[in-house]
Structures are given as structure tokens and as C-alpha cells.
């Protein structure tokens, strides 16, 4: 009986210790609602969710897919989403047009944008008098299209612009409506477009130079009050990115793309190969590309004539302090 009593007390003590150790973590579990555009760039999020990188840092992350950039920007401004990942020109638009105090805190990729066209469009000149479709007419990837068209002899007055929303909506519009002559699309929608017989007038980065596509941005006030949460989120994101592009995880990462993007295995394999390319894929550790961001500002200055055509210094839109802390803690 003495031994049973001792063993019972030991088990009780062990149970109490386990509770004492785990309770603080459980009590600190933080719910986040974020918004992203559907696409290849979400590999870090898919990995962080499936591998428990968020959970082990006390985070429960609800990932919402953006129907368009208007909802993403407005949702961030009104607190529906705490963190968003999108073309960083959206953050600049929030700061300059809506006068919202934002900070870009992390990079992601160059956008992987290509100018996709209907099969009968063989040259830029063939787009004269046609309708091009965009997410929103005055932000981000639309500027890439306008500039590619301008460099090839087409001014804004030479074509119509129709906003339809995110990449999946633009591809759908082009497949259902032949009058939707062209759109900027990114991965894996460019692969789907090719499989459906649509044409391709080339890569935006090859035509226009370095470009900061996807990045993470937040309200500065929220970040200041939730710095630890933001750092933990970024650590999980970076860990997810590292896991996703690691060759030893290729089969599992491919499955994530198959499930999340409804791709067949061949297309998912191709998508992962592009995402994990050491120089042309998702940016290592989601670093921001300074030259790419300068070009984002330059495009807004040139296309929208913002800032009287002279882009400001990038620093006013950036806060790298959270990223530095996140990386240091990995």
C-alpha cells in the first residue's frame, strides 16, 4: 500500500507539473485572421499550418483568401485582418491614398507575373482597342501591365481596363469571355492558362526589372501593441518557407499544393519546382528586395504620376525591426 500511495503521489505531481508547464502556453494562444491572395506564394503558410509551426508558437491562424485587393486593404484598415500578404504596392496605396499608417514588415517574392493573352493575340499591337482585365485599376500588378504595354507602344487611351478581382477571377474571366483580351497572371494560374491554350507575351520581371511582389504588411499601431505576436508569426512563416523548399520535403510540399490549389500532380510538381528555385523562386527567408521595392515606387510615380512623378525614399513604408527579431530567434 505504501508503494501504491507513493506512486500515486508521483503521478499526481507529474500531472500537476505538466499542467503548470503547458497552461501558460495554452493561455497565451492568440487568434489571428490574415488575408492572402490564392497562389503559389502561400507555401510558407500551408507548411506552417500543416507542420504545426504556428501552433507551437501559441498561434491559431485563420487564413482568408482575398477576392480582390479592395477587400484586403479595407479589411486590414478596419481590423478584420491583422496581417495581409499581397503585392506591396497595395500598402503604398493605403499610405498615400487612404492615409492609413501601415508598415511593410516582410517580403516574399517577385510576383511571378506574366502577361497572358487570348490565343489570337500574337503581338502587343494586337491589343490596341481591346479590353484588358485587372484586379483593381490603380494598384500593384495593373501597373506592371500598363508599363509593359507602354514600352511596347500602347498608351492607356489605346485599350479599355476592366477590374474583375484576384488572379483566379482574371483567369476565369479570360476563359469564359474572349473580349477579356489580356491579364497579368501569376503562379499557378499561368500554368493553367497555358494548359487552356492562352498565349503569353512574357515575364514582367524580364521586361521591367526587379520587382517586390508579395510582402506582408500591417497597421503600425497594431504591430506596436502586438510585437511579440507579429515576431512569432513571422518566425513560423519563415520556418514554413524553409520547410517547403527543402528537397527532402518535396513529396509532402507537392501534396500541399495539390490540396490547396486543386492542381494535378504534374502541375503541382512544376509549381513547387518554380517556388523552390534558389534564385528565381520564393525569396530566401522572405526577405524584402530593396531594388524591387524601389521599382514598385517608381512604377506608381510613372504610371499614376504620384509624388509629381518622383518616388519617395522607400524607408517611410518599411519597418524591418520585427523581421530582424524574428530571424534572430530562429
What are these regions (language model features)?
Residues 8-18:
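Sec-dependent signal peptide hydrophobic core
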Amino acid at each position: 500500500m505504501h508503494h501504491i500511495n507513493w506512486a500515486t503521489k508521483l503521478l499526481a505531481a507529474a500531472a500537476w507539473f505538466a499542467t503548470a508547464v503547458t497552461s501558460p502556453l495554452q493561455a497565451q494562444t492568440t487568434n489571428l485572421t490574415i488575408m492572402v491572395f490564392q497562389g503559389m506564394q502561400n507555401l510558407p503558410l500551408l507548411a506552417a499550418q500543416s507542420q504545426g509551426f504556428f501552433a507551437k508558437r501559441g498561434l491559431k491562424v485563420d487564413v482568408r483568401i482575398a477576392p480582390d485587393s479592395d477587400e484586403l486593404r479595407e479589411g486590414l484598415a478596419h481590423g478584420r485582418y491583422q496581417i495581409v500578404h499581397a503585392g506591396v504596392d497595395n500598402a503604398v496605396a493605403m499610405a498615400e491614398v487612404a492615409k492609413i499608417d501601415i508598415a511593410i514588415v516582410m517580403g516574399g517574392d517577385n510576383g511571378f507575373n506574366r502577361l497572358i493573352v487570348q490565343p489570337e493575340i500574337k503581338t502587343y499591337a494586337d491589343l490596341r482597342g481591346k479590353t484588358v482585365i485587372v484586379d483593381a485599376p490603380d494598384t500593384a500588378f495593373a501597373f506592371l501591365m500598363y508599363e509593359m504595354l507602354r514600352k511596347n507602344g500602347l498608351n492607356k487611351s489605346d485599350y479599355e481596363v476592366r477590374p474583375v478581382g484576384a488572379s483566379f477571377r482574371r483567369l476565369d474571366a479570360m476563359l469564359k469571355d474572349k473580349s477579356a483580351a489580356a491579364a497579368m497572371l501569376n503562379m499557378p494560374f499561368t500554368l493553367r492558362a497555358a494548359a487552356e491554350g492562352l498565349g503569353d507575351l512574357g515575364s514582367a520581371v524580364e521586361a521591367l526589372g526587379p520587382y517586390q511582389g508579395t510582402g506582408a504588411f500591417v497597421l503600425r499601431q497594431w504591430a506596436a501593441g502586438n510585437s511579440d505576436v507579429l515576431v512569432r508569426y513571422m518566425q513560423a512563416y519563415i520556418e514554413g518557407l524553409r520547410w517547403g523548399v527543402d528537397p527532402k520535403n518535396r513529396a509532402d510540399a507537392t501534396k500541399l499544393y495539390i490540396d490547396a490549389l486543386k492542381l494535378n500532380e504534374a502541375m503541382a510538381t512544376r509549381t513547387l519546382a518554380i517556388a523552390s528555385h534558389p534564385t528565381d523562386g520564393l525569396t530566401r527567408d522572405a526577405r524584402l528586395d530593396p531594388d524591387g521595392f524601389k521599382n514598385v515606387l517608381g512604377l506608381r510615380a510613372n504610371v499614376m504620376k504620384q509624388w509629381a512623378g518622383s518616388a519617395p525614399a522607400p524607408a517611410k513604408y518599411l519597418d524591418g525591426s520585427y523581421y530582424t527579431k524574428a530571424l534572430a530567434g530562429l
